[in-house]
Design a protein with these regions (language model features):
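N-terminal helix-rich module
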Residues: 2-9, 13, 21, 26-192
């Protein structure tokens, strides 16, 4: 949880200091060593003429520890995650993007990460989930939830959540800061 919140902090700080758009990206592609675990920050670079050159990685990003992963939104949940035993998918808190008002894309195509050279990215399709900050450090996903869970990969490359109460997460405020939940019971009180 702390590493993920740090990525959002770095993204907001980069947006403010470089006065440019910034995205926190989470890998959702087929590489199982990275799926829902690799997190990065990319920012838009402009040339001297003010034209967009592309997006550059802030740093190498990080991978969450094995067994910890990003919980996709409800519309993507069943494509990546299963529950076991008596656990119902409705018991799992899913991430949200809250981008209806801002129009920020929740999925982007990043052909290479990390890239030190500016590269073009595609909006609306690709192998990465995305949360965005504007050049003034505001979240384009105001009120969105970023949820993490613990589980294991099964033979079909789905994450299986054994214990829904082993969840952590945080909310993103419009001003770009993150507010963590201390445990599952706090999430229940706040979100149900």
């Amino acid at each position: 949880q702390r590493s993920m919140m740090t990525a959002f902090y770095e993204a907001r700080t980069t947006a403010l200091t470089r006065q440019t758009d910034v995205k926190v990206i989470i890998y959702k592609g087929s590489d199982i060593s990275r799926k829902l675990r690799q997190v990065g920050v990319i920012y838009k670079v402009k040339g001297e003429d003010g034209l967009d050159l592309g997006w550059v990685a802030l740093n190498d990003g990080f991978r969450m520890p094995e067994g910890v992963f990003f919980v996709p939104s409800a519309s993507n949940f069943s494509s990546f995650v299963k529950t076991s035993g008596q656990t119902s998918p409705s018991e799992i808190f899913k991430s949200t993007f809250n981008n209806g008002y801002t129009g920020a894309y929740e999925i982007v195509g990043v052909p290479e990460f990390p890239s030190r050279q500016p590269i073009a990215i595609s909006d609306g399709n690709g192998d990465w989930f995305s949360y965005q900050f504007s050049s003034d450090g505001l979240s384009l996903n105001p009120g969105a939830l970023v949820m993490l869970a613990m589980g294991h990969l099964d033979g079909d490359d789905y994450y299986v959540i054994d214990n829904p109460y082993n969840q952590l997460g945080f909310a993103i405020r419009r001003i770009g800061i993150t507010i963590p939940f201390s445990d599952y019971s706090e999430m229940e009180e706040t979100l149900r």
